[in-house]
């Protein structure tokens, strides 16, 4: 009967969900990021930027601007491009790395490439006229495309590279943020945009002896 068929379907669905839940549980780690080795001591070199010359310095910047964007990957760049489209050209971009790219700045190891079709993944293709050379672009091509976006939309003058956020405090009486950085910058802004990613730091397995 139809009623019995519905029962069988419900049982099959419950069984499938139980299997998926069991597999998910196998892959969950209660120790979170504690499962990884700390990037210190013999592993300290993994916490440095291999793509820049050591010893970079610059004078601290003290300024007021409309917006501060944290992150120079696609999220940060697209935010900046959209601000320019809206007529806002008074903003700063703060990026830990030495160039635009985010994930694709840090991850350039041999064979690294995107697992999403390039024509879907890469933004602003119509605006830049860029045509990916492969269905799944290599990390190198994506990084170079990020640089192209930076040049095409004139984002480089807005960027503070090799710089990290130290603090961001909202002052209600002044109606602004005070953003301080690892370079001693003090930047006041009305809008503070967090556009950072999660794939910029090495995660080494916490296996004894390695």
Predicted regions and their residues:
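Glycine-rich dinucleotide-binding loop and its adjacent helix/turn
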Residues: 40-57, 64, 122-132, 138-142, ...
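N-terminal Rossmann-like FAD-binding beta1-loop-alpha1 element of flavoenzymes
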Residues: 63-93
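Feature captures the FAD/FMN-dependent oxidoreductase FAD-binding
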Residues: 132-200
